[in-house]
From Swiss-Prot:
Keyword Transport: yes
Membrane topology, as annotated: Multi-pass membrane protein
Protein name: Facilitated trehalose transporter Tret1
SUPFAM superfamilies: MFS general substrate transporter (SSF103473)
InterPro entries listed in its UniProt record: MFS_dom, MFS_ERD6/Tret1-like, MFS_sugar_transport-like, MFS_trans_sf, MFS_Trehalose_Transporter, Sugar/inositol_transpt, Sugar_transporter_CS
Residues carrying a glycan: 73, 319
Gene expressing this chain: Tret1
Family in the record: Belongs to the major facilitator superfamily. Sugar transporter (TC 2.A.1.1) family. Trehalose transporter subfamily.
MF (Gene Ontology): sugar transmembrane transporter activity; trehalose transmembrane transporter activity
Source species of the chain: Apis mellifera ligustica (Common honeybee)
Primary location class: membrane
Cytoplasmic side: 1-38, 105-120, 166-172, 221-282, 341-346, 398-410, 468-502
Domain of life of the native organism: Eukaryota
Amino acid sequence: MGVENTKQTMSSQNIKPAKDSDDVLHTQFKEVKRSPMRYTMQLLAALAVSMASLMIGYSSSYTSPALVSMRDNTTATFEVTMDMAMWIGSIMPLSALIGGIIGGPCIEYIGRRNTILSTALPFLAGWLFIALATNVAMILVGRSICGFCVGVASLSLPVYLGESIQPEVRGSLGLLPTVFGNSGILMCFTAGMYLAWRNLALLGACIPIIFLILMFLIPETPRWYISKGKIKEARKSLQWLRGKTADISEELDSIQKMHIESERIATEGALIELFRKNHIKPVFISLGLMFFQQFSGINAVIFYTVQIFKDSGSTVDENLSTIIVGLVNFISTFVAAMIIDRLGRKMLLYISSILMCITLFTFGTFFYVKELMDVTAFGWIPLMSLIVYVIGFSFGFGPIPWLMMGEILPVKIRGTAASVATAFNWSCTFVVTKTYEDLVLHIGPYGTFWLFGTLVAVAFIFVIICVPETRGRSLEEIERRFAGPVRRTSAIANLKPMPITI
């Protein structure tokens, strides 16, 4: 029984395309390697949409430095209680959950690019609400607006990039949003050393302006245009993305055939479609990756970094520690972007879960020993543990769940499934951030980190059993892998489009 399951698992993790159509597609996509310049416009598109991720990172980490100055009685113009502070920290993921739900229909009806673009002005308004706040209610409104935009953007970015970027660079360019997100975290931590919460919010208000300008330079995805019957616009968009001299006829033809086949399949209710035989596995994998991403405890760590270092009694300055953590986060994600298309998604997920598991148990053990004896001489352990933990997260479970959401969800359900996955991710984020301090109160910091470490160990097993390798495969090949073997006569017809990631 165990041997049989192992065989089935191993075979499910190797994407074996049907020779007829997949070999043609694989050859087609490998031909683009002749000229690196063919990726220039795809890089520009990735950079433009990644500015939204910079805002996501800045918004996510804002509470860590801001709450310190908000609760400073010597400078505060109104009181921020402990309970209010918890809501300021947790209202953003709760609002992001709503944004994730609404973002799904938006990317289908108004397009991927327009959905991303529509977050710019609300982001600006949210930060101005916070910066000009005269009471806690205004801060909560501002955080809610920013959180809503975070949910919409985190859903739309993987969709846009998955549909716009070629397979051989999809891993590297697909991780750019995570690199930018970590840049936002680093920017917020660094600025937080010198700026009080109001000025920190004003700095956040500057980012959407740059983002707005860049988004006007890039096109909508060709797959969305084709789904709306706009073939001329799709050709123009694909030509822009692939370069003026690129021959796009074969790729455009394959996308059209995928769309025709998806339209041919009988349509049921959107949510019912999620449970079709060839849809349920990619949806389950995407939800599983989102669950383990958040229950690794990353957002509890990011939201409460300063507080964690204070509680640990570390001899290292907590503000300096947050900057070091943010810098390591940025560098390690950048390295991951450079190697993901060489090592593959699964290898980075293995490395990620092992590093996080070891460091979470180390961190928990430090807090446990701290209650029994003086650990002043070991004050460097929290910082080192957190650094290695962040490296592990940034290598795998940080960026890859969002990247794979844009790769494995079938075109037929991509908008709906991406919406469900994003809402689920932010639901988990809300649960983790809202219950973190309660967990610390009831089972202690050591119990909390041991719990996160145990869940990461389960994540390692989940990757082994369930997650397929998608490196170097076109979206069409990945979708057919989940659909199962096809007859020779329908190999080309079974190509399906690809509309869609935190």
